[in-house]
Design a protein with these regions (language model features):
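Charged, amphipathic alpha-helical stretches
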Residues: 11-16
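Short, well-ordered secondary-structure micro-motifs within conserved domains or adaptor modules
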Residues: 1-2, 18, 24-79, 85-88
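A short N-terminal interaction module
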Residues: 87-148
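N-terminal pre-triad scaffold of radical SAM enzymes
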Residues: 108, 112-119, 153-172
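Short, surface-exposed ligand-recognition loops at beta-strand->loop->(often short) alpha-helix junctions
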Residues: 5-10
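Short, charged/polar micro-motifs that form catalytic or ligand-binding hotspots
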Residues: 4, 78, 82, 104, ...
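A structural signal for isolated positions on well-ordered beta-strands in alpha/beta enzyme cores
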Residues: 2-4, 167
Length: 172
């Protein structure tokens, strides 16, 4: 698949999604020609006022879809880099989901431990909100969202019993 990156160089997030959603496709980086290329994605990242916006245009065999995702940037430059990567992944996943008409059970959570994402979401807003965000933002099925919450909760309980700050499988 021809991949054109505009305003960024977030290849890893795209390659993870490509492997999951388009098995057998190999990334080829360059300028997309919508008339000549049969399988392509153009992923554009812009930043303004401490927000990142990523728009993915995706085409395959004459069909196409587009998805935009806007996300606030905050914290250190390292944290912002992760937020940019997150936005690229969600944008690409949204376009692929629309194009293919399917969504994997773990949604857009590729290349990450779902319980780690669930733990972060629990810390930000509790279990109910975390389960809702896993389903709505990451497109995780309800059963898998509950499983991720249960795994994160088990890690929290284990850490409390052991007197640890965090359990290694969920810590950064």
């Amino acid at each position: 698949m021809k991949l054109e990156l505009i305003g960024h160089d977030e290849k890893y997030a795209l390659e993870q999604s490509l492997l999951t959603l388009f098995p057998g496709e190999k990334p080829v980086y360059g300028t997309v020609d919508k008339t000549a290329d049969t399988r392509w994605a153009r992923v554009t990242l812009t930043e303004e006022d401490e927000r990142v916006q990523v728009t993915t245009e995706l085409g395959m065999d004459g069909k196409s879809a587009a998805h935009s995702y806007d996300y606030p940037l905050s914290g250190t430059e390292y944290e912002k880099e992760g937020q940019r990567r997150h936005a690229v992944g969600i944008s690409f996943f949204g376009a692929a989901k629309d194009l293919l008409g399917i969504s994997p059970a773990w949604g857009s959570l590729t290349g990450v431990r779902p319980a780690k994402v669930a733990l972060s979401l629990i810390r930000e807003g509790g279990k109910k909100r975390a389960e809702k965000e896993l389903q709505e933002l990451y497109c995780v099925t309800p059963a898998r969202a509950r499983l991720a919450i249960e795994a994160a909760d088990a890690g929290i309980r284990a850490a409390a019993e052991l007197g640890c700050e965090a359990v290694w499988i969920m810590d950064d």
